[in-house]
Structures are given as structure tokens and as C-alpha cells.
């Protein structure tokens, strides 16, 4: 989704019966490394920013006009608890997820006179390949992130997406923070 042209071509190649998208889930997101802001790799940050912010903007721009024209639709952006407060070694990632919140809020304002809904789901610790990418393939470091806790799974987040999409059309869940029971904030976690 980082390549706008490819994304547009993929949407154009959908069968006719799938082109009228009712629910857009902007779920692309990653982070590479744990570098300090003044020591980070600018090329890696370009990838993070392109994936976490620009792809969300591109998909929204490509899909939402059709929703507006049809008078129905739901945009669900997957943000992160990291968008609420920065943490050591994650300033750029945290900034991109804060941008997801701002973009979600702004889109909701832009669409206030339509029946479209906008939701920002902000997961806490979810065990996916996210940490493997963050630690540049170091599986041991990635596994340590989840050591001593029961993290959420991708299926758990899918349940929250389903819930947000299933509420009656006269209501919208603007924002949902979802985390494991033993997580209090982005950085405060109780481990066994």
C-alpha cells in the first residue's frame, strides 16, 4: 500500500461487485528499529512514515469519495496506544500513530454532514510479526516483548473491528483503546 499507483490499480482491478466498498480498514503499520530520534536511519523512517501515514491517506482518498457518493460507509483506522504518548526508541512510530488519531478525528469532522462513520482502534500489545520487523528479524528480542504476559492477538483486534462495524448505523465508535488486562499504558505492563 506504500505505492499509490499500485493501490489504485488494485482497487480498479476488483470485480465490479466488490468496487462499492462499505468498510475501509486502514491496517498497514510498522516500525523499524529502536533508534533515538537524533540517531535514526532516515531511509527507514521514510518507510515507516510512508506505510503508517501516507498509505492511510492514499487509501482514504481512493475509497472514501465513493462512500460519500453512495451515502454510506465506515472507515476504520488501526492506530496504536503508542499514539497517546512517546516512548524511548519509538518517537517516529509514536508520531505516526498520533497522526492516525489526528487524521481520524479530522476525517470525522470532514464527514460530519454525511452518514459515514470513522473509528480509530488503538491496540496495546498484540503479538504479530510487528516486533520481528522492529528488531530487524531478531526473533529472540521480539519474543522478549511478550515474555511473561498474555498479549492480544490479531484475532482479538479483528473482534474489535467487527464490533465497531456492527453497531447500529446511527452511532459510531470514534475511538477504542484495547490492551491486555495486565497493560496499563504503552509502557506500563505487569509481567509474571
Residue ranges and their predicted role:
Residues 87-91:
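Active-site loop immediately N-terminal to the catalytic Tyr-X3-Lys motif
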Residues 35-37, 41-49:
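Substrate-binding pocket helix/loop in short-chain dehydrogenase/reductase
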Residues 120-121, 140-187:
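C-terminal helical subdomain
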Amino acid at each position: 500500500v506504500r505505492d499509490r499507483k499500485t493501490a489504485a490499480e488494485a482497487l480498479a482491478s476488483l470485480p465490479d461487485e466488490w468496487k462499492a466498498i462499505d468498510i475501509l480498514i486502514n491496517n498497514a503499520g510498522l516500525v523499524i528499529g529502536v533508534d533515538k530520534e537524533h540517531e535514526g536511519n532516515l531511509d527507514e523512517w521514510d518507510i515507516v512514515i510512508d506505510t503508517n501515514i501516507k498509505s492511510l491517506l492514499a487509501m482514504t482518498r481512493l475509497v472514501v469519495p465513493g462512500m460519500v457518493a453512495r451515502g454510506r460507509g465506515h472507515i476504520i483506522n488501526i492506530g496504536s496506544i503508542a499514539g497517546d504518548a512517546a516512548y524511548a526508541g519509538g518517537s517516529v512510530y509514536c508520531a505516526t500513530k498520533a497522526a492516525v488519531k489526528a487524521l481520524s478525528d479530522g476525517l470525522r469532522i470532514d464527514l460530519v454532514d454525511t452518514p459515514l462513520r470513522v473509528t480509530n482502534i488503538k491496540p496495546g500489545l498484540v503479538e504479530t510479526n510487528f516486533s520481528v520487523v522492529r528488531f530487524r528479524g531478531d526473533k529472540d528480542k521480539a519474543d522478549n516483548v511478550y515474555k511473561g504476559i498474555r498479549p492480544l492477538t490479531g484475532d482479538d483486534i479483528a473482534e474489535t473491528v467487527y464490533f465497531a462495524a456492527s453497531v447500529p448505523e446511527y452511532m459510531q465508535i470514534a475511538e477504542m483503546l484495547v490492551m491486555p488486562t495486565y497493560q496499563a499504558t504503552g509502557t506500563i505492563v505487569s509481567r509474571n
